Swiss-Prot record:
This protein's GO CC annotations: cytoplasm
Domain of life the protein comes from: Bacteria
Binding site for tRNA: 14, 64, 66, 112
Substrates-to-products reaction catalysed: an N-acyl-L-alpha-aminoacyl-tRNA + H2O = an N-acyl-L-amino acid + a tRNA + H(+)
GO molecular function: peptidyl-tRNA hydrolase activity; tRNA binding
EC number assigned by the record: 3.1.1.29
NCBIfam families found in the cross-reference section: pth
Alphabetized InterPro entries for the sequence: Pept_tRNA_hydro (IPR001328), Pept_tRNA_hydro_CS (IPR018171), Pept_tRNA_hydro_sf (IPR036416)
Annotated site, Discriminates between blocked and unblocked aminoacyl-tRNA, chain positions: 9
Tagged with keyword Transport: no
UniProt key word Cytoplasm: yes
Name this protein carries in UniProt: Peptidyl-tRNA hydrolase
Length: 188
């Protein structure tokens, strides 16, 4: 089984914010793979289906970003999945807007959602797709920036990044993640 989680915050208020790009990617995967997000359990919204012969679980934690591990640990336990079965999609301030980077492990890098996951999983070793949202300018506070909407100029870059994320997730169904990582990171 493959568990793909997109991190974000629940509710209309946060729907199109930079911090919710993980949710945006899950929504796109849901459409692309025809997996309806129709179950709520473990403080998450999720759906299951088969893609390229593999069982896939798409998850949007509803715990708010900073508590994402409180949703994903119980889901992994319930479905008898391990951290090696998990792919996490989330926003990254340290990447330029619209760029993606894949990683097989690493620190939280200041991202509280990832910090929560590492804490609840007991390991930093899980696959990640980081989507760049850039850094705030003109003295804007980070919290205001990540909870702000994408500008008209940023939107096409984010849409492109979400499309690339879908392609990377699709590739990871049939290839080892390390190979997918090398392929997609080379094209960044």
């Amino acid at each position: 089984m493959l568990v793909i989680a997109g991190l974000g915050n629940p509710g209309k208020t946060y729907e199109n914010t930079r911090h919710n790009v993980g949710f945006m990617a899950i929504d796109e995967l849901s459409k692309e793979w025809n997996i309806e997000l129709n179950k709520t359990k473990f403080n998450g919204l999720y759906g299951m289906g088969f893609v390229s012969g593999k069982k896939v679980l798409l998850v949007k934690p509803l715990t708010y970003m900073n508590l994402s591990g409180e949703c994903l640990r119980p889901i992994l336990d319930y479905y008898d999945a391990d951290h090696e079965d998990l792919k996490v999609i989330y926003d990254d301030l340290d990447l330029p807007t619209g760029k993606i980077r894949l990683r097989t492990k690493g620190s939280a890098g200041g991202h509280n959602g990832i910090k929560s996951l590492i804490q609840h999983l007991g390991t930093p070793e899980f696959d990640r797709v980081r989507i760049g949202i850039g850094r705030p300018v003109n003295g804007m506070k980070v919290v205001d920036y990540v909870l702000g909407a994408f500008t008209k100029e940023e939107a096409p870059h984010i849409n492109d990044a979400v499309s690339k994320t879908v392609k990377a997730c699709e590739a990871s169904l049939t290839k080892p993640f390390l190979e997918v990582m090398n392929e997609f990171n080379a094209n960044v």
